[in-house]
């Protein structure tokens, strides 16, 4: 088996697309557009980190803040992003929920007629998916605009139109568009043949390495398989040490930890659907016995599968009612 990075360079669109398909099928994402900001000269927007208490209070809602700059220029400070430029059409996502600040690129020029528009919202994923999301994505990521005519640009134009002059059912439509933004932005971040970039690493970066992308796609599609470290390394044609280094570098977790997070996320999703027995779900995600699955689920999620099915999977009430974004002025 090859060691180091031999044979791992270069893009493979098929593997990258397959990876994104599997991940989006695994994690249910809802969205809310909360605020539409009109930006003036010297504007600043600062948000504090999400607290552990807030995260615990919303068992079914791990919130990922996002910001879309429709017009103007900004500077961003966030976890892993320092003095990062943000331009019209860029999307800032905060999977880690950390403190962040956006501000006018040139606050000293207060006499200029500055104009800009910023959309602020959040993606909502089930709490059982929170660890996986934190492994898959960096704490903060800037998705650069692919340019005119791209899917991301067209989606943002529709969000802007609906936020500016909502039609019948506008609140519900904005909710669906905000949820779709998660997938469209990640597609742009993974390339999609366009010059979009993510300015931080994550497991999604494995899509750039054909061997690793193919391995992750097969892991996501065959959770019942008895995956071992030796088997994963052989599948990727890498040494065990190279495989471990690749995962640790991208996500800060080992291949085994990543596999466990994926299995628990899929199990929680199936439990919420409520159509299968606990034993059947455990078998489907790779556990030889119901008892072993029960122990693993409680250790990872903090409650038994039955408790999660009965109450832990309830939707955060704050995400149920669609509402139009509040409009406010900054600067």
Sequence positions of predicted segments:
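Short amphipathic alpha-helical interaction/hinge segments
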Residues: 100, 104-106, 185-189, 193, ...
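Loop/turn positions that initiate beta-strands
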Residues: 89-90
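Mature, function-bearing regions of proteins
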Residues: 316-320
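A short, Lys/Arg-enriched amphipathic alpha-helix from helix-turn-helix/homeodomain DNA-binding modules
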Residues: 148-160, 174-178, 194-227, 232-236, ...
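Ligand-binding loop in jelly-roll beta-barrel domains
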Residues: 82, 97-120, 124-127
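Basic/polar phosphate-binding segments, predominantly the helix-turn-helix DNA-binding elements
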Residues: 184, 188, 218-265, 282-311
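Amphipathic alpha-helical segments enriched in hydrophobic/aromatic residues interleaved with Lys/Arg
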Residues: 119-180, 184-189, 193-194, 200, ...
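Generic protein-terminus/edge-of-domain signal
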Residues: 1-84, 100-105, 321-323, 329
């Amino acid at each position: 088996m090859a060691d180091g990075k031999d044979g791992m360079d270069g893009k493979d669109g098929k593997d990258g697309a397959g990876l994104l398909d599997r991940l989006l099928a695994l994690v249910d994402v809802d969205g809310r557009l909360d605020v539409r900001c009109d930006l003036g000269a010297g504007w600043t927007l600062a948000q504090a980190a999400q607290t552990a208490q807030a995260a615990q209070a919303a068992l079914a809602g791990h919130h990922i803040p996002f910001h879309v700059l429709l017009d103007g220029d900004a500077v961003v400070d966030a976890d892993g992003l320092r003095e990062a430029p943000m331009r019209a059409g860029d999307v800032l996502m905060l999977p880690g929920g950390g403190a962040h600040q956006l501000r006018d690129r040139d606050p000293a020029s207060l006499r200029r007629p500055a104009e800009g528009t910023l959309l602020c919202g959040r993606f909502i994923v089930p709490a059982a998916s929170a660890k996986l999301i934190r492994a898959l994505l960096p704490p903060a990521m800037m998705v650069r605009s692919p340019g005119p005519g791209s899917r991301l640009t067209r989606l943002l134009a529709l969000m802007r139109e609906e936020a500016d002059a909502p039609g019948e059912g506008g609140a519900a439509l904005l909710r669906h568009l905000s949820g779709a933004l998660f997938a469209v932005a990640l597609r742009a971040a993974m390339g999609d043949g366009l010059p979009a970039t993510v300015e931080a690493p994550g497991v999604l970066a494995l899509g750039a390495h054909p061997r690793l992308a193919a391995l992750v796609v097969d892991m996501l599609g065959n959770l019942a398989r008895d995956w071992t470290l030796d088997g994963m390394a052989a599948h990727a044609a890498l040494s065990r040490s190279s495989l471990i280094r690749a995962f640790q570098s991208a996500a800060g977790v080992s291949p085994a930890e990543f596999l466990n997070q994926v299995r628990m996320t899929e199990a929680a999703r199936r439990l919420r659907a409520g159509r299968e027995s606990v034993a059947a779900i455990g078998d489907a995600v790779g556990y030889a016995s119901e008892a072993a699955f029960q122990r693993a689920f409680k250790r990872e999620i903090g409650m038994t599968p039955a408790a999660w099915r009965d109450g832990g999977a309830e939707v955060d009430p704050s995400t149920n009612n669609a509402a139009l974004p509040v409009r406010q002025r900054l600067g």
